[in-house]
Amino acid sequence: MANIVVKRLERTPIDETPVEIVERKGIGHPDSICDGIAESVSVALCKMYKEKMGVVLHHNTDQVELVGGYAYPELGGGCMVSPIYVLLSGRATMEVLDKKSGKIIKLPVNTTAVNAARDYLKKAIRNMDLEKDVVVDCRIGQGSVDLVEVFDRKRSEIPHANDTSFGVGHAPLSTTEKIVLETEKLLNSDALKAEIPAVGEDIKVMGLREGKKITLTIAMAAVDKYVNSCADYVKVKELAKAKVEENAKKYLDSHELEVCINTADDDEDCIFLTVTGTSAEMGDDGSVGRGNRANGLITPFRPMSMEATSGKNPINHIGKIYNILSNIIAEDVAKIEGVRECQIRILSQIGKPITEPKILDIEMIPENGFELEELSPKAKEVAQKWLENISEVTERIVSGNVTTF
């Protein structure tokens, strides 16, 4: 049995606190673009390594930087005058020694990475011309020898932690968290883009709950070729606002909701108009790990890790595995009858098996009528089960079925 500790979470349940702030940076935000590219490159490398070598080799592609371009958006359609620059950095296994033949096998790391980045941008930013609007530069280097050794040690056995680090998670999501998360998903959904094509992908949702009132302040890029006048622009905002309000009803209880879109607008002299749908075209820069946490949100009223999850290797990088695992365990513990709220923290020790954390800390708020003592064994059982099946987490990540931002 791993070192699993269960204790009472000594705090007011989040939905009963007087104030809560929650943020989500949408997929077209420069920071989220970097997160998405980093993770897409990692998933693509995993696939390439498995196809060519039969196993996932050491890599970390969590160093992606975006330097904003320059554009002249105009009502009816403007143009890009300087492309967005994307730098792919990090470390990966580029060559392997075949011990039988003595030959070195070179692996197409850079080609795989650039293709993955471009494929992601094509799907994520619908109105971007990949031939003209963006430059993708790959500078991924060979991995550190000592860390590769930790990665490769007894490959047939349990992977060993690459670092002494921790992951955190919580569940269930509060009303505010659900609304913020689902609002961005709605505005960037295929269905909404088909209905309101002028809505760009660069969307940031900031949720504030004061008592029973939730205010959503939304920054939403508009794509200029679909907007011929200021009246069109206002109409786009009105349509989007109505969609957000309607969608939020699924998650609201007795809360009042206020939705504010592009509050910095000042008639036609200052509106959030873009050529591509992202502010990355207008000098806004981006980096991996500067935005959403592993659960897709930024939650200053909850415990968070500053570790970037996207792009890290899914085999033994604690910054990735334990953050994702913490959220999975929290979700399952929160499903136990009698658990109102749950927080998870998992700490590793470098070089130790990832199934044997230094500590796995579970904090719970029981529902009225339930005692911590009766819930504790069930929570420990959930945590132990996931530690024993941690390879399933890796499999989900490698297959691209886990959201990292």
Curated annotation (Swiss-Prot):
Gene3D superfamilies: 3.30.300.10, S-adenosylmethionine synthetase, C-terminal domain (3.30.300.280). The keyword Magnesium applies. Pathway: Amino-acid biosynthesis; S-adenosyl-L-methionine biosynthesis; S-adenosyl-L-methionine from L-methionine: step 1/1. InterPro entries: AdoMet_synthase_2_family, AdoMet_synthase_3, S-AdoMet_synthetase_arc. GO terms for molecular function: ATP binding; magnesium ion binding; methionine adenosyltransferase activity. Pfam families: AdoMet_Synthase. It is an enzyme of class 2 (transferase). It comes from the Archaea. ATP binds at G141, Q142, G143, S144, V145, D146. Its cofactor is Mg(2+). Its EC number is 2.5.1.6. GO terms for biological process: one-carbon metabolic process; S-adenosylmethionine biosynthetic process. It catalyses: L-methionine + ATP + H2O = S-adenosyl-L-methionine + phosphate + diphosphate. Keywords: ATP-binding, Magnesium, Nucleotide-binding, One-carbon metabolism, Transferase. Belongs to the AdoMet synthase 2 family. Catalyzes the formation of S-adenosylmethionine from methionine and ATP. This is S-adenosylmethionine synthase. It comes from Methanococcus maripaludis (strain C5 / ATCC BAA-1333).
